[in-house]
Amino acid sequence: MKRIGLKMAIVAILASSAPSWAGESAAVRNCTWCHGTGAQGYTVAPRLAGQRPQYIMSQIRSFREHARDNPFSKQYMWSAVAALDSQTARDLANYFAAIPPKGANDGDSTLASRGRTIYLDGIPEANIVSCYACHGPNAEGVRDIPRLGGLAYFYLKGRLEQWGQGYHSGTESPMPMVASHLGPNEIEALASYLSFVK
């Protein structure tokens, strides 16, 4: 009897630590077609696992309002979120935030040290500000500022390039202005470094 009771307690603990939404949810399945079965992301579709729920919510709102206007957003995300109600959006954000993220580790390791310096200190003489100031010392993000650590190199590189071209993430995002000061070498170094951050 004691052994059965212990097994039941273990099952209860494991169940309570899992994300609260079942993976069979239609809304979750719709997201994982592009973002991966474990929400760990692909080349152009970012990892959602472990992302800050406030950020996910803000981006759903930006897609719905067409404020996030890069090509992939227009082609896929504007229509993908059109039918989401506020409660489902919140549930999705909390579900994905609760999944343990895996690092991409796919950048150029020889550029990581340079990228770390740019991330922490910026390049003042080139008007490149520190990423640390907003995204935190370990690129973990805060509130609706996203977690960057461990995102895929090609996704990060592409987003930085798009911001530099004037595309937006939302009406209040400073990233187009910030990225406009980054050259190709700085972008490659930053994206490489961030892909290795735990």
Residue ranges of predicted features:
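Bacterial N-terminal signal peptides
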Residues: 7-17
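Electrostatic cytochrome c docking/interface patches
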Residues: 15-28, 38-46, 98-124, 146
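Positively charged n-region of N-terminal signal peptides that target proteins for export
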Residues: 1-4
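The canonical Cys-X-X-Cys-His
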Residues: 30-37, 92, 128-138, 190
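Short microdomains enriched in Cys/His and/or Lys/Arg
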Residues: 52-63, 153-167
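The feature marks the first
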Residues: 24, 28-66
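Short cysteine/histidine-rich metal-coordination sites, predominantly Zn2+-binding motifs
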Residues: 47-54, 134, 147-154
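Axial heme c-ligation environment in periplasmic c-type cytochrome domains
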Residues: 42-49, 63-107, 142-147, 164-198
